[in-house]
Amino acid sequence: MNIYLVGGAVRDQLLHLPVKDRDWLVVGSTPDELLSLGYLQVGKDFPVFIHPETHEEYALARTEKKSGSGYTGFICDFSPDITLEDDLIRRDLTINAIAQDKNGKLYDPYHGIEDLNNRLLRHISPSFEEDPLRVLRVARFAAKFYHLGFAIAPETLELMKKLSTQGELQHLTAERVWLETEKALMTENPEIYFQTLLKIDALPALMPELATISVENFQYAMTALKNAVSLIKNMDCNKSAVCFATIFLGIIYVNPSHMTQKQQEQDNHQKNITPCLFEKLKVPAYHKELAILAGKYHIYIHNAFNLKSHTIIDLFNKWDVWRKPQRFLELLIVCAAHYSAQSKNQPTYPQKSYLLGLYQKAMTIDVKNIVSAGFKKTEIRNELTRQRISAVEKIKNCYP
């Protein structure tokens, strides 16, 4: 039995990146042998085991043979005579097919190290096209490693486009599409993921709402997305939710010069695409809530300086800022990202600090003092609202 470190851990180690998860490959063994050593079997379709002490994953070397459509139609062979090379060739990219033994020796039968040095994402073999999920994975890797200068090899890009035009992507479940998309949203350059899918004509099958917007709107959405990533850098927030809401707002975007006249038109467009987009991708509830808030209220936030105090408190109540201040901040970030994309001559977004300041002032009103003053039942809420409006009004008067 021989054990090798494989996959992303070896790749990231060679790129001098932090290694998050370590996956191990076991060659020349059987399920019974690993079970006798105390490993816990967790794999259903093929044997994957959890180490009794480190709790890291160990998989038996295997081969895969296509037996149907989509990404689940495979027959696996994990007999002990499967070699290291047999297992590595079934992987998606050469840079993910490098192994390392216990002594640190590297095994690179498919020239992954050369592609790492050349910053290329290249598929290993024609079997790449047997698994349509790899199209999304490669697009995600393109986004993940873009800041390091990586690009997709032309022949791999061509194969990805072939899979797309043949309709193979339609076999992917919404859950798997969202999983890869969410991972892409967490990268430093998520716009590369969507630009890659556009380039290979994959968007109509995966995200038709994004595929049907104009070229101008798509470019605008990608600019806003880059802005969002920049704004939340080093921040403790739900990055994938912020990025998704930013893209959503890009889809329903109406040119600011026509915003007033087309407001109703935009609202109708949003109502039409909202359930379709969220259902198509199985978007988590939090992401959906943030996106809907951004779509419904971004114009109010852009025009924050013109809002009356009672309107601001009413909006704060609708946004539930009192219980969900983090979501409020993320909503402002989404709007700031779009404002910067719209107004290139005004990169700052004073509305964000303005509304945060009003929120912080309104939060100084203590409901306990209102109760102590003798207010009861509905009177408490009415007085709380009155005092919050008054507090906000004082801050507003300090602004020109």
Curated annotation (Swiss-Prot):
Gene Ontology MF annotations: ATP binding; CCA tRNA nucleotidyltransferase activity; magnesium ion binding; tRNA binding
One Pfam family named in its UniProt record: PolyA_pol_RNAbd
Entry's Gene Ontology BP terms: RNA repair; tRNA 3'-terminal CCA addition
Classification via InterPro entries: CCA_bact, HD_domain, NT_sf, PolA_pol_head_dom, PolyA_RNA-bd, tRNA_CCA-adding_enzyme
Superkingdom in the source lineage: Bacteria
Entries under CDD domains matching the protein: NT_ClassII-CCAase (cd05398)
Gene3D superfamilies: Beta Polymerase, domain 2, cca-adding enzyme, domain 2
Catalysed conversion reaction: a tRNA precursor + 2 CTP + ATP = a tRNA with a 3' CCA end + 3 diphosphate; a tRNA with a 3' CCA end + 2 CTP + ATP = a tRNA with a 3' CCACCA end + 3 diphosphate
EC top class, as a word: transferase
Keyword Magnesium included in the entry's annotation: yes
Chain residues that bind CTP: 8, 11, 91, 137, 140
Transmembrane segments: none
Function: Catalyzes the addition and repair of the essential 3'-terminal CCA sequence in tRNAs without using a nucleic acid template. Adds these three nucleotides in the order of C, C, and A to the tRNA nucleotide-73, using CTP and ATP as substrates and producing inorganic pyrophosphate. tRNA 3'-terminal CCA addition is required both for tRNA processing and repair. Also involved in tRNA surveillance by mediating tandem CCA addition to generate a CCACCA at the 3' terminus of unstable tRNAs. While stable tRNAs receive only 3'-terminal CCA, unstable tRNAs are marked with CCACCA and rapidly degraded.
Family in the record: Belongs to the tRNA nucleotidyltransferase/poly(A) polymerase family. Bacterial CCA-adding enzyme type 2 subfamily.
Name of the protein in its database record: CCA-adding enzyme
Organism of origin: Actinobacillus succinogenes (strain ATCC 55618 / DSM 22257 / CCUG 43843 / 130Z)
